Amino acid sequence: MRKRLKTRIKICGMCSPEDMEMAALYGADAVGFITEVPIESPRKLDSDTAASLISKLPECLDSVMVIMPENSSRALELIEKVRPDIVQIHSNLPSVELEVIREKTDIPIIKTLSVPAGMGASRVQSPVKRLLDEVRRLEESGVVDSILLDSGIAGKTGGTGYVHDWDLSRRIADETELPLILAGGLKPENVQEAIRIVSPYAVDAASGVEILGKKDAVKIRSFIEEVRCANAFL
């Protein structure tokens, strides 16, 4: 059985210095910058803006650059320009490409994996088997430092704001030694229950701490307080 550790907190989708200040003030551990992704998102930044924000980041926070690169060359280009503490690969980059990033940088790598949302366990046996197989391959290859499970729905592999079946995430967590970050529809009202079920290394929130597409101080504070309450029972 895995030893339960206190769950860390990542607030994703930073767009301004004010967003970063709120995350730092209330005690987040890391913040995410969605950079140069080829999809529409209100949180998408160009690489110049991401680099500028990260250069001003409070020292108490780790910076996570979230990217969807088509190959390792593009990932390395963005890492060199933006200079985050951690890179999160939110695309189907094969292990051989991840290995190139690993060999050419010493930056920790998070690999996003998509868990089907809106289905019970009986309907997702095949997707979950594929996920488990992929997690095992990633762990055996040693090309990533952690995995992030996000909710996929209607062709989108994450950032949907939907919750998936946390029992599926717990099953994956129990099958790997890789640190597991839980995302997908997390908000102050449900994060304690998510932590109780999954026991993740970290939780990741974006839209769940926003009002009308903007980060909200009350929601960020409440989210972090709820995580701390969950941690108090560990």
Curated annotation (Swiss-Prot):
SUPFAM superfamilies: Ribulose-phoshate binding barrel (SSF51366). Pathway: Amino-acid biosynthesis; L-tryptophan biosynthesis; L-tryptophan from chorismate: step 3/5. It comes from the Archaea. Keywords: Amino-acid biosynthesis, Aromatic amino acid biosynthesis, Isomerase, Tryptophan biosynthesis. One of its GO terms (biological process) is L-tryptophan biosynthetic process. Gene3D superfamilies: Aldolase class I. Disulfide bonds: none annotated. InterPro entries: Aldolase_TIM, PRAI_dom, RibuloseP-bd_barrel, TrpF_fam. Its EC number is 5.3.1.24. CDD domains: PRAI. GO terms for molecular function: phosphoribosylanthranilate isomerase activity. It holds the Pfam family PRAI. It catalyses: N-(5-phospho-beta-D-ribosyl)anthranilate = 1-(2-carboxyphenylamino)-1-deoxy-D-ribulose 5-phosphate. Belongs to the TrpF family. HAMAP family: PRAI. This is N-(5'-phosphoribosyl)anthranilate isomerase 1. It comes from Methanosarcina mazei (strain ATCC BAA-159 / DSM 3647 / Goe1 / Go1 / JCM 11833 / OCM 88) (Methanosarcina frisia). The lineage of its organism: Archaea, Methanobacteriati, Methanobacteriota, Stenosarchaea group, Methanomicrobia. The gene is trpF1.
